[in-house]
UniProtKB/Swiss-Prot annotation:
SUPFAM superfamilies: Ribosomal protein S2. It holds the Pfam family Ribosomal_S2. Coiled coil: none annotated. InterPro entries: Ribosomal_uS2, Ribosomal_uS2_bac/mit/plastid, Ribosomal_uS2_CS, Ribosomal_uS2_flav_dom_sf. Belongs to the universal ribosomal protein uS2 family. Keywords: Ribonucleoprotein, Ribosomal protein. The lineage of its organism: Bacteria, Bacillati, Cyanobacteriota, Cyanophyceae, Synechococcales. One of its GO terms (molecular function) is structural constituent of ribosome. One of its GO terms (biological process) is translation. GO terms for cellular component: cytosolic small ribosomal subunit. This is Small ribosomal subunit protein uS2. It comes from the Bacteria. The gene is rpsB.
Length: 234
């Protein structure tokens, strides 16, 4: 049985690619046709890729792999946070800060600073500071929560990055590849499938398309982790 049906993908608009002049020829094998100057993605191939992505992701989760969801554009931001939280993954949904992976030691220190500030806020320690100092600390806390809040549970580098919009998140792609971190990527018609281990050709601009694909991947992670826990119990 298919992980995602053709009708679900059609309803979500997953078949709409970019304008034909903005395409990457490497995506040609996933393109069905062009209509009114827009490439149409072959959803039969997307369904096959989703079956593979689901199995791959489930097996990775079952073997204890750690996941990071990345998608910072407006259409994807809320969905990325929602689905990452649902499957216990870390996430970046506001802005990719240079060195998030390749300069992990520094990034980890910033995450610890965030946790310290949150403890200070909840204990009332910030409120006890002089007004100006408290305002500075709260601004720092707000900024760190915005950009690093989704990484608080990430104690080590991830094993897998799940990506929405490869071109927008090009820095994340470069850092992951430099560190040999696997990439599961939603690929629109302007992307390069050679830059990821697990390609999923689909519309990465429509909210419903992003919701559908990330939702299934989150399901796969939860299923894999449940299988891992069941194995340990036995």
């Amino acid at each position: 049985m298919a992980v995602v049906s053709l009708s679900e993908m059609m309803e979500a608009g997953a078949h709409f690619g970019h304008q034909t002049r903005r395409w990457n020829p490497k995506m040609s094998k996933y393109i069905y046709c062009a209509r009114n100057g827009v490439h149409i993605i072959d959803l039969v191939k997307t369904a096959l890729c989703m079956n593979n992505a689901y199995k791959w992701t489930r097996n990775a989760a079952k073997s204890g792999k750690r996941f990071l969801f990345v998608g910072t554009k407006k259409q994807a931001s809320d969905v990325v946070a929602q689905e990452a939280v649902r499957c216990g993954a870390a996430y970046v949904n506001q802005r990719w800060l240079g060195g998030m992976l390749t300069n992990w030691t520094t990034m980890k220190a910033r995450i610890e600073r965030l946790k310290d500030l949150e403890r200070m806020e909840s204990s009332g320690a910030i409120a006890m500071r002089p007004k100006k100092e408290a305002a500075v600390l709260r601004r720092e806390l707000e900024r760190l929560q915005k950009y690093l809040g989704g990484l608080k549970g990430m104690r080590r580098l991830p094993d897998v990055v799940v990506l929405v919009d490869q071109r927008r998140e090009s820095n994340a792609v470069l850092e992951a590849r430099k560190l040999d971190i696997s990439l599961v990527s939603m690929l629109d018609t302007n992307c390069d499938p050679d830059l990821c281990e697990v390609p999923i050709p689909c519309n990465d601009d429509a909210v419903r398309s992003v919701q559908l694909i990330l939702g299934r991947l989150a399901d796969a992670i939860n299923e894999g982790r449940k299988g891992s826990n069941d194995q340990r119990k036995n």
